[in-house]
């Protein structure tokens, strides 16, 4: 009898471990990973796909199995330990009452220890670390267990849904296991800390989250910095501008910057006349080299701008303000840089970074850097409803700003480092000494 009890007790512990490992494994593994295993022809992958596709039902089966085996462990464990320990207490002439209490306590402690450690904690750790292997091994057995006890599981699930419904709540579903953006950011941060992803991967994904929140105005090249050519410029004038400015593309004006009719590609333009004589160069027609641009309101999300640029097959979007005037432009490169970071080509060798770190707590910032980026960099809480950039913020705080003008805010000293006319080019930022 004692041997049979021990076998049953051990079997119940093993079954508990099976259900616990299955529960954690099927929750941990990704559906995309199972799809990959199916393509590789892994044994058990199709069964695993069925399980994670109907996650609610099979989690209920696991929970039922854990509950039943736990009750069985308590029931069998008490009688098993009583058979083992009773002769020992009798040998030492311990009274029946005392020995019965001691046996109950010892049985409870031992059964709890074995159930928690061997039946739950160890399988849980194993399932989390080896989710793929455990899922493939346990998928078919849990499917058979579910089929055998389907009526009972269906009744229990229905009862649970009814009780939850009394409180005006809907039962959880596997389709509701999706994570919010904030949860995904936390998961990514934890993955980075544990070494699962590197810093660049973390940065790219965070940039993608911020991508939809950016509007075109925040990343544009402002009107005053647009280098353009006139539709009436001569060949020599255009070549001189290209040599001086070294940009890839140039907007073409029909009068002023409020009338941008397209753009030229410097490489295509120069290639067209590289082997031609002077007469052809003098008689060239600029309209033959003009590519179309799109015009969008400056407040449109950059995602929408990129989609429109792809649809229209153009590299430049002209931004207009609410009055119809040109406020700036964005290129496809500007938009992509919001995800992958700075993209430098052969013309960018002399380009100055927007944020230059002099030393700890000492920076020189381009006035076009966004206020929110400054807050992220410094840990400040600067804000303005009227402007987006740090240069604009400074001008709203001090309307007669000039080189050397200073503002103190949030523990930092903001100083005008360089200006061009009335425009602030760079700000110097230093942390205040305590």
Swiss-Prot record:
The chain crosses the membrane at residues 7-27, 64-84, 101-121. PROSITE patterns: CBS, CNNM. Signal peptide: none annotated. Residues 1-201 form the CNNM transmembrane domain. Its main location: membrane. It comes from the Bacteria. InterPro entries: CBS_dom (IPR000644), CBS_dom_sf (IPR046342), CNNM (IPR002550), FAD-bd_PCMH-like_sf (IPR036318), FAD-bd_PCMH_sub2 (IPR016169), Ion_transp-like_CBS (IPR044751), Transptr-assoc_dom (IPR005170), UPF0053_domain (IPR051676). SMART domains: CorC_HlyC (SM01091). Keywords: CBS domain, Cell membrane, Membrane, Repeat, Transmembrane, Transmembrane helix. GO terms for cellular component: plasma membrane. This is UPF0053 protein YrkA. It comes from Bacillus subtilis (strain 168).
């Amino acid at each position: 009898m004692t041997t049979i009890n021990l076998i049953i007790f051990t079997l119940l512990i093993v079954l508990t471990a099976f259900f616990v490992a299955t529960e954690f494994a099927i929750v941990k593994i990704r559906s995309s990973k199972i799809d990959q295993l199916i393509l590789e022809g892994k044994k058990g992958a199709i069964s695993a796909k069925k399980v994670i596709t109907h996650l609610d039902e099979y989690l209920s089966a696991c929970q039922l199995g854990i509950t039943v085996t736990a009750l069985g462990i308590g029931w069998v464990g008490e009688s098993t330990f009583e058979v083992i320990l009773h002769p020992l207490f009798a040998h030492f002439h311990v009274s029946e009452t005392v020995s019965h209490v001691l046996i109950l306590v010892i049985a409870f402690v031992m059964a709890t220890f074995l159930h928690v450690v061997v039946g739950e904690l160890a399988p849980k750790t194993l399932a989390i670390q080896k989710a793929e292997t455990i899922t493939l091994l346990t998928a078919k057995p849990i499917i058979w267990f579910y089929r055998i006890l389907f009526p009972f599981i269906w009744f229990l699930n229905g009862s649970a849904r009814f009780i939850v419904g009394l409180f005006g709540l809907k039962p959880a579903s596997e389709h509701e296991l999706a994570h919010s953006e904030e949860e995904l950011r936390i998961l990514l941060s934890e993955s980075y800390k544990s070494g699962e992803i590197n810093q660049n991967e973390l940065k790219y994904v965070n940039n993608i989250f911020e991508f939809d929140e950016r509007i075109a105005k925040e990343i544009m090249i402002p009107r005053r910095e647009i280098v353009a050519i006139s539709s009436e410029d001569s060949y020599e004038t255009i070549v001189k501008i290209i040599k001086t400015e070294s940009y890839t593309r140039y907007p073409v004006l029909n009068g002023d910057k409020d009338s941008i009719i397209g753009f030229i590609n410097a490489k295509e333009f120069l290639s067209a006349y590289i082997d031609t004589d002077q007469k052809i160069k003098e008689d060239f027609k600029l309209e033959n080299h003009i590519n179309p641009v799109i015009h969008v309101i400056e407040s449109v999300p950059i995602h929408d701008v990129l989609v429109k640029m792809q649809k229209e097959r153009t590299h430049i979007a002209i931004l207009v303000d609410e009055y119809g005037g040109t406020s700036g432009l964005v290129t496809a490169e500007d938009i992509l840089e919001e995800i992958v970071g700075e993209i430098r080509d052969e013309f960018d060798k002399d380009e100055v970074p927007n944020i230059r770190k002099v030393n700890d707590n000492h920076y020189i910032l381009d006035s076009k850097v966004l206020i929110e980026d400054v807050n992220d960099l410094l840990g400040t809480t600067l804000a303005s409803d009227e402007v987006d950039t740090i240069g604009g913020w400074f001008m709203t705080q001090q309307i007669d700003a000039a080189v050397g003008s200073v503002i103190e805010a949030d523990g930092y000293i903001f100083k005008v480092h360089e200006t061009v006319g009335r425009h602030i080019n760079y700000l110097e930022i230093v942390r205040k000494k305590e």
